[in-house]
Amino acid sequence: MKKIHFSLLMLAIVVICTSCKREPQPMAYITSHLNVPITLYNEKDSVFLAPMQRTYLCDVEVENGKFTHCGGVNWTFCVFDPVIKIALLDTTYTVPEQYQLFLADVDSYMYHLSYSSSSSSPVKYESSCYDYVLRPDFVKEILRGAVANK
């Protein structure tokens, strides 16, 4: 009888230890190409721009304190001083500036070639257009409940 109790105890320890070694599952898995609806809002003109459904979240490479590379361009728009909002988990969030990366900071950019969501043809934009990248840690902050909706 003692052998049976000992065997059951050992089996329980093995099962518990095996389950301890499993990687904890995150609340939501953030991929590098998460599909997040984006709304761009031009506060000056009170105009909502059409959301682009495909949004690229990417890891940021910084060299000497300067942004150098992203895995994909998130969205392009041609208005000044927009308020960027994202819709996630049925809630809209305003994206703080520290979570945005401003890409159009090179004076030599006369235009930017981009692909529209409805066509595979490149579209030429004037120099007043900007590319923004949403830092993935902002979405992680939302998912862990650290960001209030606005």
Predicted segments — roles?
Residues 1-21:
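Sec-dependent bacterial lipoprotein signal peptides
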Residues 2, 9, 41-42, 61:
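Generic hydrophobic-segment detector
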Residues 20-29, 45-48, 59-61, 70-150:
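Intrinsically disordered, low-complexity segments enriched in small/polar residues
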Residues 24-26, 30, 34-40:
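N-terminal "first-domain core" detector
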Residues 35-45, 50-53:
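Short, ordered, surface-exposed loop/turn motifs in non-cytosolic proteins
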Residues 54-58:
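Short, surface-exposed beta-strand/beta-hairpin micro-motifs centered on an aromatic residue
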Residues 65-67:
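A short tyrosine-centered beta-strand micro-motif
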